[in-house]
Amino acid sequence: MHTPFRYDYVGSFLRPEVLKDARIKYENNELGLDDLTKIEDEEITKLVSKQKELGFHVITDGEFRRKTWHLDFMWGFDGIKHSKTENGLPFHGENAMLDDTYLVGRLGYKKNHPFIKHFSFLHKFEDENHVAKLTIPAPAQFLEQLVMPFAINNTLKYYNNEDEVILDLVECYKNFIADVYEAGCRNLQFDDCSWGLLVDDSALRVFNTNILGLERIKQLFVKVNNDVINSAPKDLIINTHICRGNFHSTYASKGAYDGVAPYVFKHENVNAFYLEY
């Protein structure tokens, strides 16, 4: 069962109202974790049944257990903390009020990352006609979170330069992939909005750099992704989904792929690309 299939999907789905209500109650201490997990299990089971019913060969949990598509994964590592944001992230017409996520020490992998348990539940639904796909933020997406202008000064409290960050980040991903592979994962997807920001007209301002600096960032993003991909088990299929952000049906960036194509399309060693067009 290899991906991509002739008809496929990225893997994130709109949350059912019952799940959104449950998460709000949980965050307000009106619902316990066990009760929230029970509702998540029920809604994921319904989603997987629908995916199979419609003839898809890939099954996902719709990212139903996450607060965001990417930050929850980062919060599962040592050295990372998060707190309620005051400003949010700018999307067109609206700011996404996602938790500020930042270093409080050097990155490290701790056993029992929550996503391993998430995948193990999904993996139970695999059979000879269906493969479970896990979506996680690409290493470049994680790196971007730590080296953007709003974060770099804090990051440099713990690292001398970006190359040091990459070394620890790659090690974290290698350990996570080893654990999720042992749990049965053979289809992993890197979700990656980092390239979308790089093609936007505002990229030089957003990254607070010049043209040469932007080219170096592109090189770093390819490097960190490939360092992880090249260290993964050979029978683990790794695809990537590249987009320009999506929050309440609005976008974070815009622009054609021309500026990043010589880097990501030519050199990134993924099995397949899922692309906006």
Protein language model features and the residues they cover:
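Domain-level signal for soluble alpha/beta catalytic cores
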Residues: M1-Y277
